Amino acid sequence: MNLMQTAEKQANAAQETRFFAPPKAKPGYEFAKRAFDIVMSFLALVILSPVFLAVSIAIHLEDGGNVIYSSIRLTKNGKEFKMYKFRSMCMDAEQKLDSLMSLNEMNGPAFKIAEDPRITKVGKFIRKTSIDELPQLVNILKGDMSIVGPRPLLVKYLPLYNEAVT
């Protein structure tokens, strides 16, 4: 093996190491990050409580159903938790999914259509403005999520991600 091949091999190994083994956090980092999450999510919940109230009333008035939708997700440590969102679809959205599968515009496990008839009028607005995500502040306060970090995976899609990686 010549010098150039050796250098290239070492560079590739270094890249793989950085990808698979992130650097260890400095002492106190996890504590500081958690403290930041608690303070910021608590303040946001207090400040945004009028928005929570208004959206809750609007969703309830539209169709009388549950205001909060939850789905099972995984924490960074692989523990399951319920992730909360404001409900943006009709109450029987899951039952209607099978009849809409032929309209799916995505390849793979995700389902998406441009004009999903299951999305309510209030739902369109709260999705467009990302207000539907605000209840996740409760997940952050509970320690299931963090303000800074990747979006938690849906448990039902986890096997599909594992297949794609291997």
Which ranges hold each PLM region?
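Hydrophobic structural segments characteristic of membrane proteins
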Residues: 1-18, 66, 134-166
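Juxtamembrane loop-helix boundary motifs flanking transmembrane segments in multi-pass membrane proteins
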Residues: 16-31, 114, 118, 153
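A hydrophobic, helix-centered structural microdomain
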Residues: 23-93, 165
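Cytochrome P450 core scaffold surrounding the K-helix E-X-X-R motif
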Residues: 92-100, 150, 154
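Short, solvent-exposed cationic patches
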Residues: 98-115
